[in-house]
């Protein structure tokens, strides 16, 4: 049996290794929850044996050394980390310690914030002008990232307002919204570039680029949460007051910051944020709870590595470790072949996970994945579970290579990968049963033709029994034929037939989306429908004409043009129209004749809307004569900013474009 000294040495060595991977290499090998568990184990042993604590123990310092490639900045005030709690009992114990330590009987109020999963930074302003920025590094010395921080549009280069201190060091978190993260990885997969495991790694990798021009292309954003150096000026005597003052000076502060009057209110805040977490649009891993009074903070003071007046209340882990049993290959509606890891089932964020996407061959190569490997699985919100990385230090001896198929696993057709694309595709088209199934499932889905009651299992049976080959065949189905399907009685069959009949009356935009043209989502379909007005005009459009539609570039234009150039696709459309699929004739909208504040304007929506869905908002805006675009440019007239608006809002502010919130949008929609 190992001695206590040996256990301590092994734990410290393991933690130092993972700190190096996390802080220096930006390539963590284990989940945060596993790191937290190891740290707790080390703390418990050191608490029982204080005589064995060493100055270089991971419990005695904050972080890890900065990268040598950057020059260094020494923090005038150390950037400490926070202690963690993981359950209500631990938080209530922290609350009691705070109450017991305070010498006065004054009431304690708490300032509660989101614990953003990004990169902590320090930004120094002198006379209101940004002069330097640094990472936290080891808490004493960080990396000079001034040039990169200056590219982040959410961070003001000059503060505005009155009574700005001569020297003010603002601290906060640089992070990457989920939409930006997905776009970066989507682009990387298409071009064969580096794919990031999660938004935190993407933010760190983007911020620590030696070339600021690369950082500038990444949609990073920032929220401030505290202050370091303060000279030649004053700040309010509460933490919340300071954050509100920062906001007045032009610094971004999360609108979820909340003042809680009691421990019970803190717990309610925690559970509300946990409930809202999937809809925030960016990653968090808990909430941060701080004593609001600066005077009380001073009374409480610090321990060696963290303040006594604050704590991070972390959510259940979204990452766990498990083993890959096998890798199988699925075929999508456009023929894309996606490798899927079959896992030893593991609970991640409260859900039992047994499968995880591997995206494509490049991702398997990037991960260095082999069948039998121990891997880290991540599940965030409603996102499909993903393999974050392979735990190479624990690779079994009997792992097997993952062999990507050269022929479709469903129909046997050749698999091809177009140069410049990361995705390999089955060339079988509609002769491939898998593509046929997925195309039909998309066609009847709620946001497409919206055929109520026609679920995936019905589509699977219809294809397997050869009842349906194209979307037009769906409208030829009879109740008698449907009754022959498994678990389909006469009444259910008639309901499906009725739903198909009802679905024949649709909109041009829904019809285009239902066709499943590559790269044409709902917003693009709506833009095409609004711009061309009729199917005939769209079918006849050249690639150059298609690019005149907002947010349609050369890639999307080529896919649309090629789709309508294919005779088989035109035949299916003709059959659908012959079966009675139709939509209202286009109403020619003259923006000058519409009495609407949105008429003739190019509008961009950003952030989360709480009163109506984004799709409904887009539809109403188009009805009132607006053109809804997906990105902000000099051509944009108006930006509507919901909650957690990020880089689009920052760009709009930089360009001087008018910005309104959801409340104002609803007022104008009703006017």
UniProtKB/Swiss-Prot annotation:
GO CC, alphabetical: cytosol
Statement: the UniProt record of this protein carries the keyword NAD: yes
Enzyme class, broadest EC rank: ligase
EC number: 6.5.1.2
TM regions (residue ranges): none
Catalytic reaction(s) noted: NAD(+) + (deoxyribonucleotide)n-3'-hydroxyl + 5'-phospho-(deoxyribonucleotide)m = (deoxyribonucleotide)n+m + AMP + beta-nicotinamide D-nucleotide
Cofactor(s) needed for function: Mg(2+); Mn(2+)
Catalytic residues identified in the record: 115
Pfam name, any one: BRCT
Keywords linked to the UniProt accession: DNA damage, DNA repair, DNA replication, Ligase, Magnesium, Manganese, Metal-binding, NAD, Zinc
GO BP term (any one): DNA repair
Binding-site residues, NAD(+): 32-36, 81-82, 113, 136, 173, 290, 314
Keyword hit for Protein transport: no
Protein name in UniProt: DNA ligase
Taxonomy of the source species: Bacteria, Pseudomonadati, Pseudomonadota, Gammaproteobacteria, Enterobacterales
Name of encoding gene: ligA
């Amino acid at each position: 049996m190992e001695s206590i000294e040996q256990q301590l040495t092994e734990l410290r060595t393991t933690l130092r290794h993972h700190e190096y991977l996390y802080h220096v290499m930006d390539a963590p090998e284990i989940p945060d929850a596993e790191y937290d568990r190891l740290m707790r184990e080390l703390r418990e042993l050191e608490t029982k044996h204080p005589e064995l604590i060493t100055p270089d123990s991971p419990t005695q310092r904050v972080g890890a050394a900065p990268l040598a490639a950057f020059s260094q900045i020494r923090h005038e005030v150390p950037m400490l980390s926070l202690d963690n709690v993981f359950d209500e009992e631990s938080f209530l114990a922290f609350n009691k310690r705070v109450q017991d330590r305070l010498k006065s009987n004054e009431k304690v109020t708490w300032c509660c914030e989101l614990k953003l999963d990004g990169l902590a930074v320090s930004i120094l302003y002198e006379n209101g002008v940004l002069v330097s920025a640094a990472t936290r590094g080891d808490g004493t010395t960080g990396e000079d990232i001034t040039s990169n921080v200056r590219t982040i549009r959410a961070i003001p280069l000059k503060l505005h307002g009155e009574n700005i201190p001569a020297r003010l060091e603002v601290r906060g978190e640089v992070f990457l919204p989920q939409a930006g993260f997905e776009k970066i990885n989507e682009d990387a997969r298409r071009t064969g570039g580096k794919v990031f495991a999660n938004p935190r790694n993407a933010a760190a990798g983007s911020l620590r680029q030696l070339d600021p021009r690369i950082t500038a292309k990444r949609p990073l954003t920032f929220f401030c949460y505290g202050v370091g150096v303060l000279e030649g000026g004053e700040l309010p005597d509460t933490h919340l007051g300071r954050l509100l003052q920062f906001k007045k000076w032009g610094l971004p502060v999360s609108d979820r910051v909340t003042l809680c009057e009691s421990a019970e209110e803190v717990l309610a805040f925690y559970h509300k944020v946990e409930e809202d977490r999937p809809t925030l649009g960016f990653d968090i891993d808990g909430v941060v709870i701080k004593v609001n009074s600066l005077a009380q903070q001073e009374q409480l003071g610090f321990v060696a590595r963290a303040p006594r007046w604050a704590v991070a209340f972390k959510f259940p882990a979204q990452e766990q470790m498990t083993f890959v049993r096998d890798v199988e290959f699925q075929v999508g509606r456009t023929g894309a072949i996606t490798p899927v890891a079959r896992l030893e089932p593991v609970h991640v964020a409260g859900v039992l996970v047994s499968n995880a996407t591997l995206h494509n061959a490049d991702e398997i190569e990037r991960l260095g994945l082999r069948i039998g490997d121990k891997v880290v699985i991540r599940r965030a919100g409603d996102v499909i579970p993903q393999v974050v990385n392979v735990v190479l230090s624990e690779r079994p001896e009997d792992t097997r290579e993952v062999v990507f198929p050269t022929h479709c696993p469903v129909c046997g057709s050749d698999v091809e990968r177009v140069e410049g694309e990361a995705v390999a595709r089955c060339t079988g088209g509609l002769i491939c049963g898998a593509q046929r199934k997925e195309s039909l499932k998309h066609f009847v889905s709620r946001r497409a033709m919206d055929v109520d009651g026609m679920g995936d299992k019905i589509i699977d049976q219809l294809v397997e029994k050869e009842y349906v080959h194209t979307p037009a065949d769906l409208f030829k189905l009879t109740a008698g034929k449907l009754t022959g399907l498994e678990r389909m009685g006469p009444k259910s069959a008639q309901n499906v037939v009725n739903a198909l009949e009802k679905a024949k009356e649709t909109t041009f935009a829904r019809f285009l989306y239902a066709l499943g043209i590559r790269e044409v989502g709902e917003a693009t379909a709506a833009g095409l429908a609004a711009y061309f007005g009729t199917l005939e005009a769209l079918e006849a459009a050249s690639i150059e004409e298609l690019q005149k539609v907002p947010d349609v570039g050369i890639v999307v234009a080529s896919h649309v043009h090629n789709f309508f150039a294919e005779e088989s696709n035109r035949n299916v459309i003709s059959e659908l129209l012959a079966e009675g699929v139709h939509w209202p004739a286009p109403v020619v909208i003259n923006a000058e004749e519409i009495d609407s504040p949105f008429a003739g304007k190019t509008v961009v929506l950003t952030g989360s809307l709480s009163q109506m869905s984004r799709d409904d908002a887009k539809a109403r805006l188009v009805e009132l004569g607006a053109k809804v675009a997906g990105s902000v440019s000099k051509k944009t007239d108006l930006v509507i900013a919901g909650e957690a608006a990020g880089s689009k809002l920052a760009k709009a502010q930089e360009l001087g474009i008018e910005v309104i919130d959801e409340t104002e949008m609803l007022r104008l929609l009703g006017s």
